[in-house]
Curated annotation (Swiss-Prot):
Residues 1-26 are annotated as: Disordered. This is Catalase-peroxidase. It is an enzyme of class 1 (oxidoreductase). Homodimer or homotetramer. There is a cross-link at residues 97-219 (Tryptophyl-tyrosyl-methioninium (Trp-Tyr) (with M-245)). It comes from Rhodopseudomonas palustris (strain BisB5). One of its GO terms (cellular component) is cytosol. HAMAP family: Catal_peroxid (MF_01961). Its cofactor is heme b. Bifunctional enzyme with both catalase and broad-spectrum peroxidase activity. Binds 1 heme b (iron(II)-protoporphyrin IX) group per dimer.
Length: 732
């Protein structure tokens, strides 16, 4: 047989070189539900392996030695990237700030907790220009101490040391941020170009999910909204974006003024002379970006953005000069050598040092967003108080900096190292330590029996336990069942938590708690937080037994009940779900995702895999977990029994599905022969039969031999959610 191919000339029919690649599935079907986020940063991408315990490694670190080396680094100027004013402090503060400053309260994502700044897209954001140099300057120290300190911790620690080395007393430092090993691929905005601002609607309404004003910025445009040098208008952007990072006005003023006490911005020349960002660079650039053709490209010729601003007379020393200059001068609009809008002190003497020539001086300069602290009425009051009371300013900046760099770490039980502050802060969502003997296995069995005899249904117990635990966000480690904050506002009043039912369940559980605790003589107690979870466990076991399957739901006591004064109700508002596919709930607030997308998003926040998401949803449907007790997705005639009926009936080809003509967002499943209505479901339900990957998972649980596996896998996923915030268990 002739081995030659017809018109290929014997050549391989697949393209090579030139960056060619075939189309991915999403190129063909861009509207396909993406569930890849459920499997990113798994142990498969972690080179350190499952057994590696970063918290333990950090505890063995000689922290004093690292800090000493960082102090030495600050003034060890390198020829390939010289230090401004002979000190890298300003650069390192910016690196740490921009590592933490991506945090957003909406979903808890972003922040310093995972060392994501070294990955795309953050490593190539315009606002992070030349921070690649800061990270390369740190490499010898990271290399020296290896796995005992993560990049994530090193970024934040370096920022602290930079401040300390310039005479500022920080509030403290906590280690414990384990590195991740691949980009998170978050939704940073709808724009397809850097600095795009299609995220606004109406009268400058910023997209609900986002925390910055333009693609590739951490917060705001320093030249003003869309480059308009209006300090008052800029203040509106500042207030909005900093609030979405959990900062109030005082913290915002302290952070801006404190951070801008040090260092400078870089706009020495034409920005068009800057080369590609790190991800767009050539192979030989080895991950360094923004190579500049302006002069030497570094030092006095450095270009990071547009403005060329030095705020204070002592840019490597803590001072009150920022406020002295802000209020001491009148300001006139100017342009940097790069053509950016900025402000200079009107009629001022040249008192600010040049970063590289000790014989030269400059006049003080400010950004439009700096002047916002004077010309916005609310900011002005705070700024003037800080100006007149430097000690208050220093304390406010220290606390705000600590909050900025630790906000996404979760509760203090996750903090590591000897520099952890002793003071409890309300934004840490404190929970009292265990101060009593915990219940025994015998007590647990007794409490389960009392709960099941209380008249509460499987549906009520499961719904309450899930409502309590599913507030957890793995992104910033907030929420969860520990603390039993579901009994406080705002959670007790959320529509998704069915307030009337919730009040009834909590009332009966509190009565059981009181009766049990009052009967103890040796100080043994059970918390309501534990009892809520135990009630769900008892209900799941009963539902499985009623379906003919024996299961034991693991339960570990040790949760405590938070006090109302330990709960910042306003800060918990962001945990309220707009939609919750696990409970077939769509709220009244604006939805910016399809219901099935919101389900995947929520599953990722709960740290669930696709199989765990699948089995958990299927189980909750038959257990009566829907909000409002509606029947959508309840594909069973055996409710409150832990069966695999959801999958069996969804996959049944005797049923034909169509969009309801009378109910929005509802699908009707009718008998193919008779047309009789069998079931109703939502997009969240039907996606498990429509999406090929999710259907494959559903088929595992819809098989004839699947009942036992289904029950066991449901229990495992359920327990994972119930224990998601039990960092005390992980620490043991």
């Amino acid at each position: 047989m002739d081995a030659k191919t017809d018109d290929q000339g014997g050549k391989c029919p697949f393209p090579h070189g030139g960056g060619s690649r075939g189309h991915r599935n999403r190129d063909w079907w861009p509207e396909q539900l993406d569930i890849n986020m459920l499997h990113r940063n798994s142990t498969l991408s972690d080179p350190l392996g499952k057994a590696f315990d970063y918290a333990k490694e950090f505890e063995s670190l000689d922290l004093d030695a690292v800090i000493k080396d960082l102090h030495a680094l600050m003034t060890d100027s390198q020829d390939w990237w010289p230090a401004d004013f002979g000190h890298y402090g300003g650069l390192m503060i910016r690196m740490a700030w921009h590592s933490a400053g991506t945090y957003r309260t909406t979903d808890g994502r972003g922040g310093a907790g995972a060392g994501q700044q070294r990955f795309a897209p953050l490593n190539s954001w315009p606002d992070n220009a030349n921070l690649d140099k800061a990270r390369r300057l740190l490499w010898p120290i990271k290399q020296k101490y290896g796995n005992k300190i993560s990049w994530a911790d090193l970024y934040v620690l370096t920022g602290n040391v930079a401040l300390e080395s310039m005479g500022f007393k920080t509030f403290g430092f906590a280690g414990g941020r384990a590195d991740t090993w691949e980009p998170e691929e978050l939704f940073w905005g709808p724009e397809g170009s850097w600095l795009g601002d299609e995220r606004y609607s109406g009268e400058r309404q910023l997209h609900d999910a986002l925390g910055a004003v333009q693609m590739g910025l951490i917060y705001v445009n320093p030249e003003g909204p869309n480059g308009n040098p209006d300090p008052v208008a800029a203040a509106k952007d500042i207030r909005e974006t900093f609030a979405r990072m959990a900062m109030n006005d005082e913290e915002t003023v302290a952070l801006i003024a404190g951070g801008h006490t040090f260092g400078k911005t870089h706009g020495a020349g034409d920005p068009s002379l800057i080369g590609a960002e790190p991800e767009g660079g050539a192979l030989e650039d080895q991950g360094l970006g923004w190579k500049s053709k302006f002069g030497t490209g570094f030092g006095a010729d450095a270009i990071t953005g547009g403005p060329e601003v030095i705020w204070t007379q002592t840019p490597t020393q803590w001072s009150n000069f920022f406020f002295e200059n802000l209020f001491g001068f009148e300001w006139e609009l100017d342009k940097s050598p790069a053509g950016a809008k900025q402000w200079k002190a009107k009629g001022a003497e040249a008192t600010v040092p040049d970063p590289f020539d000790p014989t030269k001086k400059r006049v003080p300069t400010m950004l439009t967003t700096d002047l916002s602290l004077r010309f916005d009425p609310a900011y002005e009051k705070i700024s003037r108080r800080f100006f007149e009371n430097p000690d208050q300013f220093a304390d406010a900046f220290a606390r705000a900096w600590f909050k900025l760099t630790h906000r996404d770490m979760g509760p203090k039980v996750r903090y590591r190292g000897k520099l952890v502050p002793k003071e409890d802060l309300i934004w840490q969502d404190p929970i009292p330590p265990v101060d009593h003997e915990l219940v025994s296995a015998k007590d647990i069995a007794d409490l389960k029996a009392r709960i099941l005899a209380s008249g509460l249904s499987v549906s009520q117990l499961v719904s309450t336990a899930f409502a309590s635990a599913s507030t957890y966000r793995h992104s910033d480690k907030r929420g969860g069942a520990n603390g039993a904050r579901i009994r406080f506002a705002p959670q007790k009043d959320w529509e998704v938590n069915q307030p009337a039912d919730l009040a009834q369940v909590l009332g009966k559980l509190e009565a059981i708690q009181k009766a049990f605790n009052d009967a103890q003589s040796g100080g043994k107690k059970v918390s309501l937080a534990d009892l809520i979870v135990l009630g769900g466990s008892a209900a799941v076991e009963k539902a499985a037994k009623d379906a003919g399957t024996e299961v034991e739901v693991p339960f570990t006591p040790g949760r405590m009940d938070a006090l109302e004064e330990q709960t910042d109700g306003d800060s918990f508002k962001v945990l309220e779900p707009r939609a919750d596919g696990f409970r077939n709930f769509i709220g009244k607030r604006h939805q910016f995702m399809q219901p099935e997308e919101a389900l995947v998003d929520r599953a990722q926040l709960l740290n669930l895999t696709a199989p765990e998401m699948t089995v958990l949803l299927g189980g909750l449907r038959v257990l009566g977990g829907n909000v409002g007790h509606d029947s959508h997705g309840v594909f069973t005639d055996r409710p409150e029994k832990l069966t695999n009926d959801f999958f069996v009936n969804l996959l049944d080809m005797k049923t034909a599905w169509s969009l309801s003509a009378t109910a929005e967002g509802v699908y009707e499943g009718r008998d193919r022969k008779t047309g009789d209505l069998r079931w109703t479901g939502t997009r969240v339900d039907l996606i498990f039969g429509s999406h090929s990957q999710l259907r494959a998972l559903a088929e595992v649980y819809g098989q004839s031999d699947a009942q036992t596996k289904f029950a066991q896998d449901f229990v495992a996923a359920w327990t994972k959610v119930m224990n998601a915030d039990r960092f005390d268990l992980a620490a043991k």
